[in-house]
């Protein structure tokens, strides 16, 4: 989106996810458009290099355990003195304060402690964790918004940067709805309900088709529920007291699912989707990646794009979102596999270090 991003390269990040011929695929997409440098912050010369880098930077993001930067003499006060306009995002599992601040924090712990896992899964099954790093992703999104707010405040009001304390735990908890208020006012505790949301309406579930595919259907709004019953050839159900309004459908949710699921199970996915589309019902296929890549809507919007990678050749990955009308984002490069790929550019060209100095720092293990 126009900003220059530099990431401190680490070997451990390259061991995550799938690989092809030893090349980490997760790394390729997660760190696209970022310049990768190596930097040993436990070394005094590494600390001095960081101070030079942040002298004219807008934002610095770190995710060390609280107190680590201070141990290296790189705490907020020091960084702010060097660059009063700098915004520093401090990401940690549990935040910079509180009794858990020194605990190691991972997304899995946040997904558990936020209440997300407790409300996810089947009623008779275990708490269910997401199939990808949801908590980490949410923390990244919240961090991005926070940075934009801080930069706006700096540029239009105070002229000063600030420190942003972001835990991985709290963003995900924030997205889990009205649970705190419902417990405070009603003593209600939300439990696992599978794909149903009985507090909102019915039908809302996933249903298997005759040919083994799955469809997701949501008819929480009264008008949508009426359309579903008409679409499946049961218009009389709209006058049945058991299904006439949302509250009644929730009370008879098992019967609703049996009726809707029975009809869907007797039809192929193509037949069911066509029928529901005709009646403007809210229904969609449950896709794996093959469905996404072959879907004409994803193709028309170029949701998945192809990037030229120097090692793998043309590779597919998610495109930039959202779509800006005047200044669209672009994927300029995939993440380089070689550690410290941009060391010479950043340290040599930007900071003015000589090739001899770079070689010396590399020999010492500073970069």
Predicted segment positions?
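Flexible glycine/proline-enriched surface loops and loop-helix/loop-strand junctions
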Residues: 125-135, 208-213, 327-330
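Aromatic-enriched alpha-helical interface/lid elements that frame and gate functional surfaces
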Residues: 203-279, 283
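A glycine-rich dinucleotide-binding beta-alpha-beta segment and adjacent secondary-structure elements
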Residues: 278-332
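Flexible, small-/acidic-enriched active-site or ligand-binding loops
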Residues: 244, 312-360
């Amino acid at each position: 989106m126009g900003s220059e991003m530099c990431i401190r390269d680490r070997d451990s990040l390259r061991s995550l996810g799938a690989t092809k011929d030893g090349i980490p695929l997760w790394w390729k997409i997660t760190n696209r458009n970022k310049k990768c440098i190596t930097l040993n912050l436990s070394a005094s010369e590494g600390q001095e290099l960081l101070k030079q880098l942040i002298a004219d930077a807008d934002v610095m993001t770190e995710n060390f355990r609280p107190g680590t930067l201070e141990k290296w003499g790189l705490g907020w006060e020091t960084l702010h003195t060097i660059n009063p306009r700098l915004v520093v995002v401090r990401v940690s599992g549990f935040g910079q304060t509180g009794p858990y601040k020194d605990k190691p924090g991972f997304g899995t712990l946040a997904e558990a402690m936020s209440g997300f896992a407790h409300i996810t899964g089947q009623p008779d099954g275990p708490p269910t964790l997401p199939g990808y790093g949801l908590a980490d992703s949410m923390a990244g999104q919240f961090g991005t918004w926070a940075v934009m707010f801080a930069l706006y405040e700096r540029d239009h009001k105070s002229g000063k940067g600030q420190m942003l304390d972001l835990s991985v735990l709290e963003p995900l908890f924030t997205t889990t709805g009205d649970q705190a208020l419902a417990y405070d006012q009603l003593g209600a505790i939300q439990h696992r309900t599978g794909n149903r949301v009985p507090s909102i309406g019915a039908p809302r579930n996933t249903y298997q088709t005759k040919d083994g595919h799955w469809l997701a259907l949501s008819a929480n709004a009264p008008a949508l529920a009426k359309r579903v019953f008409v679409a499946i050839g049961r218009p009389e159900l709209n006058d049945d007291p058991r299904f006439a309004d949302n509250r009644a459908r929730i009370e008879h949710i098992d019967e609703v699912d049996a009726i809707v699921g029975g009809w869907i199970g007797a039809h192929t996915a193509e037949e069911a989707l066509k029928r529901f589309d005709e009646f403007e019902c809210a229904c969609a296929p449950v896709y794996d990646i093959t469905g996404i890549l072959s879907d004409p809507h994803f193709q028309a919007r170029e949701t998945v794009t192809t990037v030229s990678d120097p090692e793998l050749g043309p590779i597919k990955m998610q495109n930039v979102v959202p779509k800006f009308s005047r200044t669209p984002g672009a994927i300029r490069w995939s993440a380089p596999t070689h550690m410290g790929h941009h060391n010479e550019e950043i340290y040599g060209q930007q900071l003015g270090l000589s090739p001899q100095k770079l070689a010396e720092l590399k020999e010492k293990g500073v970069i």
